[in-house]
Structure formats: C-alpha cells, structure tokens
Curated annotation (Swiss-Prot):
The chain crosses the membrane at residues 2-22, 76-96, 112-132, 152-172. Keywords: Cell membrane, Lipid biosynthesis, Lipid metabolism, Membrane, Phospholipid biosynthesis, Phospholipid metabolism, Transferase, Transmembrane, Transmembrane helix. It comes from the Bacteria. PANTHER family: GLYCEROL-3-PHOSPHATE ACYLTRANSFERASE-RELATED (PTHR30309:SF0), INNER MEMBRANE PROTEIN YGIH (PTHR30309). This is Glycerol-3-phosphate acyltransferase. It comes from Bacillus velezensis (strain DSM 23117 / BGSC 10A6 / LMG 26770 / FZB42) (Bacillus amyloliquefaciens subsp. plantarum).
Length: 193
C-alpha cells in the first residue's frame, strides 16, 4: 500500500505544470498557447525568456529529484528510479494540465541528479557540447540520452541501464515531430549559443 501511495505521490509531483505556473505568474500567459505549445523548458525559454525559462527548467529538474528521493525520505522500500519514472510520466502526462506536458528531458535529468549525480553532471556538459555543435535543443537532448546509455554500459547498475534506456527511448519518441523538422530543415535553432 505504501509503495502504491509513493508512486502516486511521485506522479503528482511530476504532474505539477511548472511551465504553466511560471507562464501565468511571469507573463500572464498559458505557454501551451504560444511557441510549440509544449509545457517543457525549451518552450518556456522561447516563450517566456531566460529568467522564467530557467525557473521552469529548475522546477522540472527538481520534480524528478524530489520524486527519486521519496523512497529515502519516506522510508518506503521501492527503488528510487521507479519513483523517478513515475514523476517523469507525471511530467509528460500531467493530471493538472489535461495530460499534455513536457518531453521528459529535464525531469528525467532530475531523477538522475538524485540517483547518479556524476552522470547528471556529465550529461549537462555533454548536452551543452551538442548544443554548441548543432544549435538544436531537441537533437542535443536526444544525443545526450544516447550518451547516457553508453555511460551506463560501463556502470555496474543494471537498473540504471534499463531505466536510462527506457527514458531515452521515451525522450526520442516524444521528439518525433522535432526529428521530422530536423530532417525537413524547419526545426528552429537557438541563436544565443
């Protein structure tokens, strides 16, 4: 029973629509009606600006971190990665935003920030290298996921490898429209990096 409640709590934490809340507070807008229409950090940066976008990405990361920490904080015998995955699902399909959320990148990163902080730090560095080289946030996110799988092949943690592989596949799936735009050369590039 406690495990089920923890999973539900992790999902609810993940469901907190950071982009929607920050958009309303910072600019008085629903970011789902602007830019890509996505609740995630990339649309928040593009729609709300750097300050508000930074708040959104920090909140989205912290959702994953908090959810992964719940088993330790509440002394519930469940693997922290499972609680983290529940938060990622909540982020992508948020109960508080008509089940239309982000693309799972920042919240997945937050899970790894708690469970494998060194991996998280290297992921951030790799993401920015890819971003500098490609100028595509979406492609950088997907390539960072692939890097994460490769990293996990050298770590003796089968749970981490399985979860990272599933999350990366999910992130790539969530970016399928971006992949089409990259192929068609219509995906927007960042201009500030």
């Amino acid at each position: 029973m406690l495990i089920a409640l923890l999973i539900i709590l992790a999902y609810v934490i993940g469901s907190i629509p950071s982009g929607l809340i920050v958009g309303k507070l910072a600019k008085g807008i629903d970011i789902r009606e602007h830019g890509s229409g996505n609740l995630g950090a990339t649309n928040a940066f593009r729609t709300l600006g750097v300050k508000a976008g930074s708040v959104v990405i920090a909140a989205d990361i912290l959702k994953g971190t908090l959810a992964a920490a719940l088993p330790y904080l509440l002394h519930v015998p469940i693997h922290p990665l499972l609680a983290g995955v529940a938060a990622v699902i909540g982020h992508v399909f948020p109960v508080f935003a008509k089940f239309k959320g982000g693309k799972a990148v920042a919240t997945s990163g937050g899970v790894l920030l708690f469970y494998a902080p060194l991996l998280f730090v290297t992921m951030v560095a790799v993401f920015f290298v890819f971003l500098f080289l490609t100028k595509f946030v979406s492609l950088s996110s997907m390539l960072t996921g692939i890097y994460t799988i490769i990293y996990c092949l050298f770590v003796k943690d089968p749970y981490l490898l399985v979860v990272v592989t599933l999350l990366t596949a999910f992130v790539i799936y969530r970016h399928r429209a971006n992949i089409k735009r990259i192929i068609n050369k219509t995906e927007p590039k960042i201009k500030w990096f």
